[in-house]
UniProtKB/Swiss-Prot annotation:
Lineage of the species this protein comes from: Bacteria, Pseudomonadati, Pseudomonadota, Alphaproteobacteria, Hyphomicrobiales
RNA-binding found in the keyword field: no
Record protein name field: Trans-aconitate 2-methyltransferase
GO molecular function annotation: trans-aconitate 2-methyltransferase activity
Species whose genome carries this gene: Mesorhizobium japonicum (strain LMG 29417 / CECT 9101 / MAFF 303099) (Mesorhizobium loti (strain MAFF 303099))
Subcellular location field: Cytoplasm
Gene: tam
Length: 256
């Protein structure tokens, strides 16, 4: 895929940061020495880590040069690097490994979770949040639109696979954790209109569908997709639309 756009991502910064804030609040580590933000993006989640643990050595990494550039401007005293979660390895044990809305993009993330647990210091925690919204109209319409387009062959394989059920993550992580907490939260975001929903997903879920297309194809796709979204998300009494956004949270603490 083309590089991620920090500016597009930050159009809905408050809404995107709220799940990270909810995840940070549930990490059962009071005085960590080293905290790492995997897939730190433009630094909005990293900022929460610095606020909760001001005395910790907080760092972050991402695969996107644009995201890292913005994160360094936002938090000049934090170390940010380009790295891939699937191959990253810390130089020494870490007390908190934090990953907000990253691992849904990595099909091999269950194996990566197991690796990351091995990088924790005793009493450390792995904290993960992933969108679990592939059955929502916002994402169903992406797949429907892709299948209808005359250039559908270009979009084969664009859709990411669904996440495993909660029981899978429990069975995967419980042998590795002294304490394991898994839960779902469905956020209901009031947005201006259907176009706002499209703007939201442009920087994330819609990106794999748009990147392979030329300008004319992209316009054709977006016109069709936006029309479907307008039908799927009717206006509320105040004229806005509600974007329902389910997410799964996993916090696994290693024995101390």
């Amino acid at each position: 895929m083309a590089d991620w756009s920090a500016a597009q991502y930050l159009k809905f910064e408050d809404e995107r940061t709220r799940p990270a804030r909810d995840l940070v609040a549930q990490v059962p580590v009071d005085f960590p020495r080293r905290v790492v933000d995997i897939g730190c993006g433009p630094g909005n989640s990293t900022e929460l880590l610095v606020q909760r643990w001001p005395d910790a050595q907080v760092s972050g990494f991402d695969t996107s040069p644009d995201m890292i550039e913005k994160a360094r401007v936002r938090l000049p005293n934090v170390s940010f690097d380009l790295a891939d979660a699937s191959t990253w390895q810390p130089a020494e044990p870490v007390n908190v490994i934090f990953a907000n809305a990253v691992f849904q993009w990595l099909p091999t993330h269950p194996a990566v979770f197991q690796r990351l647990m091995g990088f924790l210091a005793p009493g450390g925690a792995l904290a993960v949040q992933m969108p679990d919204n592939l059955l929502e109209p916002s994402h169903q319409m992406m797949r429907d639109t892709a299948a209808e387009m005359p250039f559908a062959d270009k979009l084969k394989g664009a859709a990411r696979g669904p996440l495993p059920p909660v029981s899978f993550y429990y069975d995967l992580m419980s042998p590795l954790a002294d304490r394991l907490d898994i839960w779902h939260t469905a956020y209901n975001h009031p947005l201006a209109d259907a176009e706002a929903i499209v703007e939201w997903v442009k920087s994330t879920g819609l990106k794999p569908f748009l990147d392979p297309l030329d300008a004319d194809e992209r316009k054709m796709f977006l016109d069709s997709y936006t029309a479907k979204i307008a039908k799927a998300y009717p206006k509320t009494a105040d004229g806005k639309v509600l974007l329902r956004f389910p997410r799964i949270f996993i916090v696994a603490k290693r024995a101390g």
